[in-house]
Amino acid sequence: MKTAITILMITMAVSEFSASQNVNWRSLRDDQNNLVQFNFGYDYGVTAGMGYARTFSAIRPVLLGLDISLPMGNNLSDDFKVRLGGQIEIVEIAGFAATVRVASVFRKYHNDFVNIASFGSDFGIVAGYSAPTWSIGGEFGFDKAITSHLKHAAIMKEMFPDIKDGWYVPTGGNYYYGLAAGKTLGETYDLSLRLGATRAQGNDENAILPMYLQLGLGARF
């Protein structure tokens, strides 16, 4: 019972997929190295977020960035997610391109029973067609909590005296797959859409509504 409760607590904290900035490499100008994005959507609940990223020229185009997302609610500091990572376009042929994303993820989750801090990783790939004013493609990724620290409330310790605070290593993660599209507005702004499904590794902890939706507005400068 104690093990099952611990697994459930960690699953509650890390079940959301890793949202990230959409980038259309074809729409970026040489004098636009900075990107900011604001997004809103559904991610195991209604969420909002913002992020900043900067592009660099290497062998292939590279984007490094930081973003934060929070659920819509009264106590925004109780639950949040911070991602630090990068994207690189690995191939481009006549507008058809593939981009790889890698990020480290920190999550905080709190309720009346437990406070959880989780460190994890996210790996994804986006492949599709990009033109200077629009893009569309498919994405696939895997989001995994590497380790989580649980601090249980007094009520939990009263109900389950053997339960322990400390670090735990989850055994699973979450796959996500879906559509990624974008539309350039003028010389500076971009609209983006991400829509897809999520699936827990092992199919044993899937969400009641296993999907995600993200609408974003970005600016390049």
Predicted regions, residues:
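Outer-membrane beta-barrel transmembrane domain signature
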Residues: 114-208, 219-221
